[in-house]
Amino acid sequence: MLTFVGLGLYDEASVTVAGRDAIAAADRVFAEFYTSRLIGTDVAALEAHHDTTIERRDRAGVEQHPEPILDAAADGDAVFLTAGDTMISTTHVDLRMRAADRGIDTRVIHAPTAASAAAGLTGLQNYRFGKATTLPFPWAHGADGVPGSVTDTIEANRERGLHTLVYLDIKVDHPRVDGDAYMTASQAADLLATNWDADALGVVVARAGAPDATVRADRLGALADADFGSPLHLLVVPGSLHHIERDALRELAGAPADAL
Amino acid sequence: MGRRKKIVEQCERLMDNPEQIRNIAIAAHVDHGKTTLTDNLLAGAGMISEDTAGQQLAMDTEEDEQERGITIDAANVSMTHEYEGDDHLINLIDTPGHVDFGGDVTRAMRAVDGALVVVDAVEGAMPQTETVVRQALREGVKPTLFINKVDRLISELQEGPEEMQERLLSVIGDVNELIRGMTEEKDDIEDWTVSVEDGTVAFGSALYKWGVSMPSMQRTGMDFGDIIDLERSDKREELHEQTPLADVVLDMVAEHFPNPIDAQPRRIPTVWRGDADSEIAESMRLVDEDGEVVLMVTDIGVDPHAGEIAAGRVFSGTLEKGQELYVSGTAGKNRVQSVGIYMGGEREEVDEVPAGNIAAVTGLKDAIAGSTVSNEEMTPFESIDHISEPVITKSIEAQNMDDLPKLIETLRQVSKEDPTISIEINEDTGEHLISGQGELHLEVQTQRIERNQGIPVTTGEPIVVYRETPTSDSQEVEGVSPNRHNKFYITVEQLSDDVLEEIRLGEVSMDMPEQERREVLQEAGMDKETSQDVENIIGRNIFIDDTKGIQHLNETMELVVDGLTDSLEDGPLAAEPVEGALIRLHDARLHEDAIHRGPAQVIPATRDAVHRALIDADIRLLEPIQDVRIDVPSEHMGAASGEVQGRRGRVDDMYQEGDLMVVEGIAPVDEMIGFSSDIRSATEGRASWNTENAGFRVMADNLQREIIMEIRERKGMKTELPESITHF
């Protein structure tokens, strides 16, 4: 059995009870933290919390050489952990299908993820989100500034009145950076303000799931100059606003009246 | 006032009169006597003593040049000569004749308007003669001919007037055949063949310092009969006084070579692709000393006191100290610290050097041989590509770890001075690679590092540079990214020989206007549609984008090219460069989000797919080969041809020429390492030979695996090939 367990948004307490039980029952516990990580904890604290040993896999160890995970799942109970939910944004559906190919049973235990927090914290309704996109570091993609596909996505959503959830790039163990790099919401707002539209409204969500989670709405140009503290951040570019959404952004996200 | 100073002042006066300037190069096969001739000209102009000319070899200033008795670097010199009552300023470049140093010849030709081709009367036109004439004509440089060592025909071979005439006419005929072949298709060149009647051919002996030409005979009244008499009776001194070589040759230079005003309007369109209607084009055509400054750097040298010196041709404007100039291909400006002209091996600083001259400049720290230097940003000159490419590599290490930084700096400097040298720095292992034109080329360069820089080095055995090439067309191959969300569908086809040749010669590149590129490719036989879809030219391979309207592909294309470049630099057989592949992208499936189709996904997907397609296209190892010509007495002919055949070589022709037999053939460069000593012992030192790099050839199938494993082992790669390789 291979069980995909989402660890939730912030620290070792963000996992669901069902997830905790699955980890406790597993023979082997694997995890990947190259797509995202729990900012409020580390692997050692997680191991202590769950009283288990976590085998951390890098990108190649998941995408190119998943055999050890699959072998463990074929022989016994294995769990595979990621931050957030295992099947949203970073989709590990490929790993699940490879397991199915080998006749291994699989199940998914969900957890809160950035997409649900974005709606949950900003008051923007999840019915009114369009396609999501990721803003990469300028050096990490094949074009200059902001990739056309990012602004195309935002604009296509806005034409239909829809909000865009913009994930911000994370580089873990990347040869180009020392340590880990997390794009901040102000860097993202600056990139979009410079390459797209400085007057457009943006909503920053910082440290979703943490006790000090922060939400701020303002023009992108103004968000570019603000500091939202430690990671992880994400950014929402709203489309048209329902009146309740407008009120929420003003009340809960401090949006200045002239920006709405 | 010293004599030298006087000449410098005379030169400075003449520099402002382009009509009076001749920029020339002396070029020839090795040992045909260029440098001795140059000494004669210098002595004639009063630059060195008459007595030592011929032995002094004033131009061979490097210690190793004097030791080896050959010219290695192209050297510059200026002199004055009076012809028909007018003083002329002659800027002269002596070039190396040995084939390994051909890059210097090519670069020198860019700076000059006339090439004095020197041919040995006894040996006749040789392979290197053909190469230098070709190099000159390609650059739009006008040739004249000096047939040297005529004294040997008279004294050694005891030839009579008729035999001599026949021999000289055949040399002229050979050279003219070359000239006709190269200029037939050029409409901007009238008849450039040389002839005795026109005065574009001179004869003589650089060693004994006499010379004749049709005009000189008319002037002095000395005909061939008189010359034979004097030479036979050993009255060479008299011969020299009556008809001195320097006057005969320098008169020919002044009369028959174009001055910059005549030459530049014709040469600029050949060597510069910028806007012909621009002000700068006009100023270059007119050799306008008041126009914008344009200098084409053809040589970088190092002076122990002044540091790096850039030498080159001033095509427009006037170079002065303190100017801030752009250097093509680099950002920012360099400040000119001094300007000068050359006298022998020495540089004389002057206040300014106007258009039409060859200048020596310090302070251009970013310039390399081939840079365009100007006071406003401009289209650079056509790159001076020397057509032969590195075929031999040696590893080079500093003996003392402390010398490591200095060695790296020196290696970089060497490749800056000689673009036919290529350097691969490996800071991790400290074992660097230096690649060049041949064994001698590398030996000279490494000795110079030891001697001039005082860095003791250890060098490895010379290694041949291999390549990999597809020998058939592949089926469609699917490349999948590690996350399996992105797929690329590609094929590999063989590039036609004609297209490959155009890339090799630099006639087609991504730097040229698209329309022009299409035309060249179509003329070389590429179909129209393919030529319109060229996405990139990667090394000597072409990448075609056959896809239509795939969303997000445009922002992924750079990564696709990165993946292709990786796979083509390190081929699947032995990580040697791939050439001659036409890679076609037929279709692609991409993830919606940029982060899931980033470098970590796209590069491995395309790199793998290209390697698999290359294997499917029966990729094979290519090795460099050389044309070999051996001149040998008939009793040693068997031994000589055996030396070629024993080296996996092929003898194509054997024929008699004079009292010698000539053996012609080809052999792999790898097997030719160590040829010099073997042929010497096989023929008791009686053979003279010449080799010339002749491109790459597919290696025989029964050797493929063995050589590939040798290379893989040397590179520390796995010594097994992918199982899918079954075609040899």
Swiss-Prot record, chain A:
Ordered alphabetically, the record's keywords are: Methyltransferase, S-adenosyl-L-methionine, Transferase
User: Can you name one GO molecular function term for this protein?
Assistant: diphthine synthase activity
Q: What SUPFAM superfamilies does UniProt report for this protein, alphabetically?
A: Tetrapyrrole methylase (SSF53790)
Named in its record, the pathway it takes part in is: Protein modification; peptidyl-diphthamide biosynthesis
* Pfam families xref list: TP_methylase
Q: Where are the annotated coiled coils located?
A: none
What are its E.C. numbers?
2.1.1.98
Annotated S-adenosyl-L-methionine binding sites = L9, D85, I88, T113, A114, L168, A208, H233
Q: Which domain of life is it from?
A: Archaea
**What family does the entry list?**
Belongs to the diphthine synthase family.
| Subunit details | Homodimer.
Q: What does this protein do?
A: S-adenosyl-L-methionine-dependent methyltransferase that catalyzes the trimethylation of the amino group of the modified target histidine residue in translation elongation factor 2 (EF-2), to form an intermediate called diphthine. The three successive methylation reactions represent the second step of diphthamide biosynthesis.
Q: What is this protein called?
A: Diphthine synthase
Name its species: Halobacterium salinarum (strain ATCC 700922 / JCM 11081 / NRC-1) (Halobacterium halobium)
* UniProt lineage: Archaea, Methanobacteriati, Methanobacteriota, Stenosarchaea group, Halobacteria
From Swiss-Prot, chain B:
Carrying Diphthamide, the residues are H596
InterPro entries per record: EFG_II, EFG_III/V, EFG_V-like, EFTu-like_2, G_TR_CS, P-loop_NTPase, Ribosomal_Su5_D2-typ_SF, Ribsml_uS5_D2-typ_fold_subgr
Q: tr-type G domain spans which residues? A: 19-261
The record's GO molecular-function terms, alphabetically, read: GTP binding; GTPase activity; translation elongation factor activity
Sites where the protein binds GTP: 28-35, 94-98, 148-151
Annotated keywords: Cytoplasm, Elongation factor, GTP-binding, Nucleotide-binding, Protein biosynthesis
Please state which protein family the record places this protein in.
Belongs to the TRAFAC class translation factor GTPase superfamily. Classic translation factor GTPase family. EF-G/EF-2 subfamily.
PANTHER family in alphabetical order: ELONGATION FACTOR-LIKE GTPASE 1 (PTHR42908:SF3), TRANSLATION ELONGATION FACTOR-RELATED (PTHR42908)
User: What is this protein called in UniProt?
Assistant: Elongation factor 2
Species: Halobacterium salinarum (strain ATCC 700922 / JCM 11081 / NRC-1)
